[in-house]
């Protein structure tokens, strides 16, 4: 029997940083970076700009704004039912695979309010309203159909329509660089001029099982593509990590169908880790530069076991919207911006060299965020 290689926390952390372009900034075009990362969480509209600045050399925020207005990337509800900034191609290819999960997650919040509502009829009514191509807020769409379904209330109707039943895109100017704008939604097909890709007729159900979720599984080709893309940007990783990233139930049929093309490891807890054979797995002692992460960055949220990036004691920071600072590849501080000054709050003591490196990267971030009006940074005393 061949013994499976065990990868320690530091080795997994360095692999994650390498895949995420956080170990060494990349020179790839912005669109390619968004595609490689499988999108960026974007519920806070300005955060993807910081995420890409930390990953790309000479990142020009205007390039991302141009991709949004040019309809090459879109802001849409997708993984985990959260707003993600993804390429137009990925939005169309992946949306149908996420439909069942999106419905279930909204029902998990509004099951009582939506009891008795025929969701297919609600979807048809919402689509009819949106067919004119006019951008609408969630509330406007909900009120347009509320006469037929008065009981659920506009919030439940709007969430189900915008976040689940109708593939929609959030229109610019929301999401443009240094721009504040409310959410206005249009049908994804209207905005991109293409319908979403239908699921292949291979028998796969919503979670990669049989058509009813319990019978024989198909090969789930869309799921296989998701697995490959996830491992390229996040691996090595367990099935639970994959589910934490996308919200889908582990993609068991997809993983089973492609096992022969994957390699396996184990972590120190004994979990099986899957990976692409030729993906980078740097030496655990590879130096890791200071990096500033935006709120809700998938480098942290894209795992069930986030221990490769953040200590269990600080795990709660990753889901409350705290912006994190990585020192030696691990979460060591949080950061905010006040009046053009980047303020860093350490979670542990820094050596003199670490403090200097944090200050240097913080000055560069302040200059980026202010378009060179300020390079002020303040590093607070350690707790």
Language-model segments: which ranges?
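Long, low-complexity intrinsically disordered regions
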Residues: 1-306, 312-383
